Amino acid sequence: MSSTRSPLKTKNENTISTKMNNMSFVDKENTPPSLSSTRILASKTARKIFDESEGQSKAKKGAVEEEPLLKENPHRFVIFPIQYHDIWQMYKKAEASFWTAEEVDLSKDLQHWDSLKDEERYFISHVLAFFAASDGIVNENLVERFTQEVQVTEARCFYGFQIAMENIHSEMYSLLIDTYIKDSKEREFLFNAIETMPCVKKKADWALNWIGDKNARYGERVVAFAAVEGIFFSGSFASIFWLKKRGLMPGLTFSNELISRDEGLHCDFACLMFKHLINKPSEETVKKIIMNAVEIEQEFLTDALPVKLIGMNCDLMKQYIEFVADRLLLELGFDKVYRVENPFDFMENISLEGKTNFFEKRVGEYQRMGVMSGTTDNTFTLDADF
C-alpha cells in the first residue's frame, strides 16, 4: 500500500539548509551539531529546538558584528599594515621572551629534593601536577575558541605564540616531575592529575566548563581565562618563590620566574582584549567570575593542598590571592572588592603584571636580542666620539 505522506524534505528544510550554508564561520562555531543541513528534523519538538537555536544564533551574530575584534576580517591572513599597535606590541613582548625547557639547569635540584621533608616534596609534586595539566587546558581554549573567534590579525599572532609558550610550560613541568619523581606509578598518578586528584579536577572542570559554554560571550570567557592565568596560578607561583627565598631548588625556581613572567603577560593581554570590547560584561558579572575563582584557589591552597606543608601561613596566602584578584579587577577597569595589602614582601617585584619592571629586567637574559628594539636602533654609523 503506497503512502500518501509528503516527503520530509519540505520547503522549510530547504530554507534551513540555505541558511546553514550562508552562515559565517563564527556562527557555525556556535551552532549545535544537530543543526547540520544533512540532518532531518523529524518532529515538532526538533523544529521547536531549531527555532529557539536560530533565534539565539541571530542574537549572537548581531553581537559579533558589533565587536571589531570578532567581526569577519578578509584581511586577517596578512599582518601589515598594523591596525592595533597596542596588541602588536604585546605580541612583540611575547616574542622577545621566548625560551625553551632545555635552557633550565636542573643539575642541582635533585640534591635539594632529597633533603626536603616528605610534606614539602608532597606539596611541590602536586603543584607541578596541577601546572602540567593546566597549561594544556589553556591551550584547549585558545585552539577551540579564541583563535577561531578573534579576527584581528595582531591578536591571532599573540594567541599563536601563546600556544607555543604554553606547550613549553607544560613540557617544563612534565620534565620537572620526570626529574624529581623516580617511582613510575607516582609519576603516572601526577601526570594524570585531572583524573586522579579531586583538588586539581575541581580547578580543571571550572576552566573546561567555560570552554564548553556556548552561551557565554567572548568577553565573559576572556575574564574567566584571565582568572585562570592570573588567580589560579598566582598562589602556586608564590609558593615556589617562597622556596627560592629559602635558597632551595634553583632549577625549579628559575623556571618558575620565566613561566610566571609569561603568564603575567598572557593575563595582561586578556585585559587588553577586554578593553577593546565594545559590549563588555557588566561589573557584577565580572566580579562574580573573579570572586568564584578566588574561592576555588583559596580552597586549593589552604585546604586541599595547604601551603603550611612548606611552612607558609594559610591566612596570608588567602590574603595574597585576594590581593591578586583586586589587582586584576583594576586592570580590567573595575573597583577592588577585597581591598587588602600584599602580605608577601618577596612577591613585590614578581607580580603577575607583565607590564612591571619584572619583564624589563630580562630575567636570566631571556629576552631575545633586538626583538624589542626599533628599526633605528640597528643602524651603523661612523660618527662615534673617541
Swiss-Prot record:
This is Ribonucleoside-diphosphate reductase subunit M2. The keyword Cytoplasm applies. Binds 2 iron ions per subunit. It comes from Danio rerio (Zebrafish). Its main location: cytoplasm. Belongs to the ribonucleoside diphosphate reductase small chain family. Its EC number is 1.17.4.1. Keywords: Cytoplasm, Deoxyribonucleotide synthesis, Iron, Metal-binding, Oxidoreductase, Phosphoprotein. The active site is at Y173. It is found in: Cytoplasm. The modification Phosphoserine is found at S6. Fe cation 1 binds at D135, E166, H169. Heterodimer of a large and a small subunit. Its cofactor is Fe cation. InterPro entries: Ferritin-like_SF (IPR009078), RNR-like (IPR012348), RNR_small (IPR033909), RNR_small_AS (IPR030475), RNR_small_fam (IPR000358). One of its GO terms (biological process) is deoxyribonucleotide biosynthetic process. The keyword Cytoplasm applies. GO terms for cellular component: cytosol. Fe cation 2 binds at E166, E229, E263, H266. Provides the precursors necessary for DNA synthesis. Catalyzes the biosynthesis of deoxyribonucleotides from the corresponding ribonucleotides. It holds the Pfam family Ribonuc_red_sm. Residues 1-24 have a biased composition (Polar residues).
